[in-house]
Protein backbone atom coordinates (compact mmCIF):
# COMPACT_ATOMS: atom_id res chain seq x y z
CA UNK A 1 0.00 0.00 0.00
CA UNK A 2 1.34 3.40 -0.98
CA UNK A 3 1.17 6.04 1.73
CA UNK A 4 0.31 9.69 1.12
CA UNK A 5 3.86 10.67 1.95
CA UNK A 6 5.16 8.56 -0.92
CA UNK A 7 3.06 10.46 -3.55
CA UNK A 8 5.09 13.24 -5.07
CA UNK A 9 3.20 15.96 -6.97
CA UNK A 10 5.22 18.37 -9.13
CA UNK A 11 5.12 21.93 -7.88
CA UNK A 12 3.54 23.46 -11.00
CA UNK A 13 0.78 20.81 -10.97
CA UNK A 14 -0.05 21.62 -7.38
CA UNK A 15 -0.21 25.33 -8.12
CA UNK A 16 -2.53 24.71 -11.09
CA UNK A 17 -4.88 22.62 -8.94
CA UNK A 18 -5.02 25.34 -6.31
CA UNK A 19 -5.90 27.97 -8.94
CA UNK A 20 -8.68 25.79 -10.37
CA UNK A 21 -10.17 25.24 -6.92
CA UNK A 22 -10.07 28.95 -6.13
CA UNK A 23 -11.75 29.87 -9.41
CA UNK A 24 -14.45 27.27 -8.88
CA UNK A 25 -15.18 28.70 -5.44
CA UNK A 26 -15.13 32.43 -6.15
CA UNK A 27 -16.60 32.72 -9.68
CA UNK A 28 -20.35 33.52 -9.86
CA UNK A 29 -22.76 30.77 -10.91
CA UNK A 30 -23.29 32.13 -14.45
CA UNK A 31 -19.61 31.89 -15.26
CA UNK A 32 -19.26 28.47 -13.60
CA UNK A 33 -22.16 27.14 -15.65
CA UNK A 34 -24.90 27.39 -13.03
CA UNK A 35 -28.19 29.25 -13.31
CA UNK A 36 -30.33 29.74 -16.35
CA UNK A 37 -27.49 30.84 -18.61
CA UNK A 38 -25.89 27.42 -18.42
CA UNK A 39 -28.72 26.01 -20.49
CA UNK A 40 -27.91 28.33 -23.38
CA UNK A 41 -25.89 27.03 -26.27
CA UNK A 42 -24.39 28.49 -29.42
CA UNK A 43 -26.64 27.88 -32.39
CA UNK A 44 -24.99 28.06 -35.79
CA UNK A 45 -27.31 29.72 -38.30
CA UNK A 46 -26.49 29.05 -41.94
CA UNK A 47 -25.69 32.17 -43.99
CA UNK A 48 -28.94 33.34 -45.61
CA UNK A 49 -29.11 33.51 -49.36
CA UNK A 50 -28.43 37.05 -50.53
CA UNK A 51 -30.16 37.97 -53.76
CA UNK A 52 -27.88 40.01 -55.99
CA UNK A 53 -29.66 41.99 -58.70
CA UNK A 54 -29.02 42.10 -61.52
CA UNK A 55 -27.15 38.83 -61.82
CA UNK A 56 -25.45 40.01 -64.99
CA UNK A 57 -24.20 43.58 -65.45
CA UNK A 58 -26.16 45.72 -67.91
CA UNK A 59 -24.74 45.98 -71.42
CA UNK A 60 -22.46 48.97 -72.03
CA UNK A 61 -24.05 52.07 -73.50
CA UNK A 62 -22.89 52.95 -76.99
CA UNK A 63 -22.62 56.75 -76.89
CA UNK A 64 -22.11 56.86 -80.65
CA UNK A 65 -25.68 55.69 -81.23
CA UNK A 66 -28.70 57.93 -81.37
CA UNK A 67 -31.72 57.19 -79.20
CA UNK A 68 -33.56 55.94 -82.27
CA UNK A 69 -30.78 53.47 -83.04
CA UNK A 70 -30.50 52.40 -79.41
CA UNK A 71 -34.18 52.23 -78.47
CA UNK A 72 -36.10 52.45 -81.76
CA UNK A 73 -37.63 55.78 -80.72
CA UNK A 74 -36.70 59.33 -81.70
CA UNK A 75 -37.51 60.60 -78.24
CA UNK A 76 -35.94 59.60 -74.95
CA UNK A 77 -38.68 59.39 -72.33
CA UNK A 78 -37.11 60.20 -68.98
CA UNK A 79 -38.65 61.38 -65.69
CA UNK A 80 -38.14 65.13 -66.10
CA UNK A 81 -37.26 65.78 -69.70
CA UNK A 82 -38.20 64.50 -73.15
CA UNK A 83 -35.63 65.84 -75.61
CA UNK A 84 -36.36 65.51 -79.30
CA UNK A 85 -33.39 64.53 -81.40
CA UNK A 86 -31.56 66.83 -83.80
CA UNK A 87 -33.88 69.83 -83.82
CA UNK A 88 -31.22 72.50 -83.27
CA UNK A 89 -30.54 75.29 -85.75
CA UNK A 90 -27.87 77.97 -85.25
CA UNK A 91 -29.55 81.31 -84.42
CA UNK A 92 -29.46 83.42 -87.59
CA UNK A 93 -28.20 86.66 -86.07
CA UNK A 94 -25.32 85.17 -84.07
CA UNK A 95 -22.13 84.51 -85.98
CA UNK A 96 -18.41 84.88 -85.46
CA UNK A 97 -17.54 88.55 -84.97
CA UNK A 98 -15.15 90.05 -87.53
CA UNK A 99 -13.68 92.80 -85.36
CA UNK A 100 -11.20 93.21 -82.52
CA UNK A 101 -11.81 94.18 -78.93
CA UNK A 102 -10.65 93.11 -75.47
CA UNK A 103 -11.97 94.23 -72.12
CA UNK A 104 -8.77 93.83 -70.13
CA UNK A 105 -10.52 94.62 -66.86
CA UNK A 106 -13.19 91.97 -67.20
CA UNK A 107 -11.71 89.10 -69.21
CA UNK A 108 -11.09 85.78 -67.47
CA UNK A 109 -7.81 85.23 -69.28
CA UNK A 110 -6.02 86.16 -72.51
CA UNK A 111 -4.29 83.64 -74.74
CA UNK A 112 -3.04 83.61 -78.34
CA UNK A 113 -4.28 87.12 -79.16
CA UNK A 114 -7.75 86.33 -77.85
CA UNK A 115 -9.62 87.42 -74.75
CA UNK A 116 -11.79 84.80 -73.06
CA UNK A 117 -14.71 85.50 -70.77
CA UNK A 118 -16.69 83.24 -68.43
CA UNK A 119 -20.03 85.02 -68.10
CA UNK A 120 -20.91 86.00 -64.55
CA UNK A 121 -24.56 85.18 -65.12
CA UNK A 122 -25.78 81.69 -65.98
CA UNK A 123 -27.73 80.95 -69.16
CA UNK A 124 -29.21 78.05 -71.08
CA UNK A 125 -26.95 76.69 -73.78
CA UNK A 126 -29.01 78.27 -76.58
CA UNK A 127 -29.08 81.51 -74.60
CA UNK A 128 -25.28 81.67 -74.66
CA UNK A 129 -25.32 82.80 -78.32
CA UNK A 130 -27.15 85.96 -77.36
CA UNK A 131 -25.38 86.38 -74.01
CA UNK A 132 -21.95 86.31 -75.65
CA UNK A 133 -22.96 88.52 -78.57
CA UNK A 134 -24.21 91.17 -76.14
CA UNK A 135 -21.44 90.81 -73.56
CA UNK A 136 -18.92 93.21 -75.14
CA UNK A 137 -18.19 94.44 -78.67
CA UNK A 138 -16.86 91.64 -80.91
CA UNK A 139 -17.57 88.78 -78.48
CA UNK A 140 -19.24 85.53 -79.55
CA UNK A 141 -20.02 82.06 -78.19
CA UNK A 142 -16.81 80.06 -78.47
CA UNK A 143 -16.04 76.40 -79.05
CA UNK A 144 -12.57 75.63 -77.64
CA UNK A 145 -10.15 73.84 -79.98
CA UNK A 146 -7.89 71.09 -78.55
CA UNK A 147 -5.02 73.54 -78.00
CA UNK A 148 -7.26 76.05 -76.19
CA UNK A 149 -9.32 73.63 -74.10
CA UNK A 150 -6.59 72.85 -71.50
CA UNK A 151 -6.19 76.59 -70.85
CA UNK A 152 -9.94 76.94 -70.38
CA UNK A 153 -10.19 74.03 -67.94
CA UNK A 154 -7.21 75.28 -65.91
CA UNK A 155 -9.24 78.41 -65.18
CA UNK A 156 -12.12 76.38 -63.72
CA UNK A 157 -12.28 75.10 -60.18
CA UNK A 158 -13.16 71.49 -59.35
CA UNK A 159 -16.93 72.04 -59.16
CA UNK A 160 -17.36 74.47 -62.06
CA UNK A 161 -18.59 73.75 -65.57
CA UNK A 162 -19.58 76.04 -68.42
CA UNK A 163 -21.34 75.88 -71.75
CA UNK A 164 -19.12 75.97 -74.83
CA UNK A 165 -20.02 76.74 -78.43
CA UNK A 166 -19.47 73.29 -79.92
CA UNK A 167 -22.63 71.93 -81.55
CA UNK A 168 -24.02 69.89 -84.38
CA UNK A 169 -27.02 70.25 -86.64
CA UNK A 170 -28.90 67.07 -87.47
CA UNK A 171 -26.55 64.16 -88.07
CA UNK A 172 -23.68 66.44 -89.08
CA UNK A 173 -20.26 66.74 -87.51
CA UNK A 174 -19.65 68.65 -84.31
CA UNK A 175 -18.52 72.17 -85.19
CA UNK A 176 -18.48 75.77 -83.91
CA UNK A 177 -18.95 79.34 -85.15
CA UNK A 178 -15.25 79.26 -86.09
CA UNK A 179 -15.84 76.17 -88.24
CA UNK A 180 -13.82 72.98 -88.12
CA UNK A 181 -14.67 69.55 -86.73
CA UNK A 182 -14.61 68.63 -83.06
CA UNK A 183 -14.32 65.41 -81.13
CA UNK A 184 -17.08 65.28 -78.50
CA UNK A 185 -17.99 62.83 -75.77
CA UNK A 186 -21.54 62.32 -76.97
CA UNK A 187 -24.86 61.72 -75.21
CA UNK A 188 -27.35 60.58 -77.86
CA UNK A 189 -29.84 63.16 -79.02
CA UNK A 190 -28.00 66.19 -77.68
CA UNK A 191 -26.62 69.11 -79.68
CA UNK A 192 -25.15 71.19 -76.81
CA UNK A 193 -21.80 70.83 -75.03
CA UNK A 194 -20.05 71.88 -71.86
CA UNK A 195 -16.64 71.46 -70.23
CA UNK A 196 -15.56 71.03 -66.61
CA UNK A 197 -12.25 71.04 -64.75
CA UNK A 198 -11.24 67.56 -65.88
CA UNK A 199 -12.63 67.55 -69.43
CA UNK A 200 -10.28 66.46 -72.20
CA UNK A 201 -12.90 67.06 -74.92
CA UNK A 202 -16.25 68.90 -74.87
CA UNK A 203 -19.06 66.77 -73.45
CA UNK A 204 -22.59 66.83 -74.83
CA UNK A 205 -25.30 67.43 -72.24
CA UNK A 206 -28.67 65.67 -71.98
CA UNK A 207 -30.48 68.87 -70.97
CA UNK A 208 -29.53 72.05 -72.86
CA UNK A 209 -31.90 74.16 -70.77
CA UNK A 210 -29.77 73.86 -67.63
CA UNK A 211 -28.21 77.14 -66.49
CA UNK A 212 -24.43 77.50 -66.68
CA UNK A 213 -21.91 80.26 -67.42
CA UNK A 214 -20.98 80.64 -71.10
CA UNK A 215 -17.55 80.67 -72.72
CA UNK A 216 -17.24 83.83 -74.82
CA UNK A 217 -14.28 85.11 -76.83
CA UNK A 218 -13.14 88.16 -78.75
CA UNK A 219 -10.17 88.73 -81.04
CA UNK A 220 -7.53 90.95 -79.51
CA UNK A 221 -5.93 93.74 -81.52
CA UNK A 222 -2.27 93.23 -82.40
CA UNK A 223 -1.45 96.85 -81.62
From Swiss-Prot:
Disulfide bonds: 99-138, 102-115, 128-214, 132-216, 192-208
Top-level taxonomic group: Viruses
Keywords: Disulfide bond, Host-virus interaction, Lectin, Membrane, Transmembrane, Transmembrane helix, Virion
Ranges of the Virion surface topological domain: 30-223
Cellular localisation: Virion membrane
Limits of the C-type lectin domain: 111-217
TM annotation in the entry: 9-29
Gene Ontology cellular component list: membrane; virion membrane
GO molecular function: carbohydrate binding
Positions in the Intravirion compartment: 1-8
Annotated SUPFAM superfamilies: C-type lectin-like (SSF56436)
Family the entry assigns: Belongs to the epstein barr virus gp42 family.
Known function: Plays a role in virion attachment to host B-lymphocytes, through binding to leukocyte antigen (HLA) class II and subsequently participates in fusion of the virion with host membranes. May act as a tropism switch that directs fusion with B-lymphocytes and inhibits fusion with epithelial cells.
Domain notes per entry: The C-lectin type domain is essential for virion-induced membrane fusion.
Quaternary structure and partners: Forms a complex with gp25 and gp85 via its N-terminus; this complex is used for invasion of B-lymphocytes.
Protein name: Glycoprotein 42
Amino acid sequence: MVSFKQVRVPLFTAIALVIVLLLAYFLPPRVRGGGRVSAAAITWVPKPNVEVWPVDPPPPVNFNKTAEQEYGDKEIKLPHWTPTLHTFQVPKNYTKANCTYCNTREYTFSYKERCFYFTKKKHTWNGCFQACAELYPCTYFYGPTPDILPVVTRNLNAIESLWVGVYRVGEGNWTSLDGGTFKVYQIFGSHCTYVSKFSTVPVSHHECSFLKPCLCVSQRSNS
